[in-house]
Amino acid sequence: MKPQFVGILLSSLLGAALGNRMRCYNCGGSPSSSCKEAVTTCGEGRPQPGLEQIKLPGNPPVTLIHQHPACVAAHHCNQVETESVGDVTYPAHRDCYLGDLCNSAVASHVAPAGILAAAATALTCLLPGLWSG
């Protein structure tokens, strides 16, 4: 095999392996901690947690929203569980975010788009050399 082809193949495999992992802000669970400064890379099968919506019964019913601070296992996503506080039971809906750094109020999608553009440019420059002999 040509060395250029092997390089492209290895780069593609590395990009695919790392490209599936997302980053999330790790707030540490503390309201005073700065989420913008602590970034964690979520492992495969561990998407970013989303908002937990807790609907409390009453007149009128109340919905509490809680944002989880870090990556979670995929089986915890999109779940509805029953939680109890004293004599009151209520449903808790847990969803997960999809996308890089999306557990923030301002999601960042520039990095993945930039990586794709750079990869497309590199392939455009390198592929003609493979067929030129």
UniProtKB/Swiss-Prot annotation:
Main location: membrane
Tissue expression per record: Expressed in the adult lung, and in fetal liver, lung, kidney, brain and spleen.
Protein topology in the membrane: Lipid-anchor; GPI-anchor
Lipid attachment residues per UniProt (GPI-anchor amidated serine): 104
Pfam families named among the record's database cross-references: UPAR_LY6
Cystine bridges: 27-35, 42-71, 77-96
An annotated Gene Ontology molecular function: identical protein binding
Top-rank taxon: Eukaryota
Subcellular location: Cell membrane; Cell projection, Filopodium
InterPro entries: LY6_UPA_recep-like, LY6G6d/LY6G6f
Signal peptide limits: 1-19
Protein's name in the database: Lymphocyte antigen 6 complex locus protein G6d
Designated gene of the protein: LY6G6D
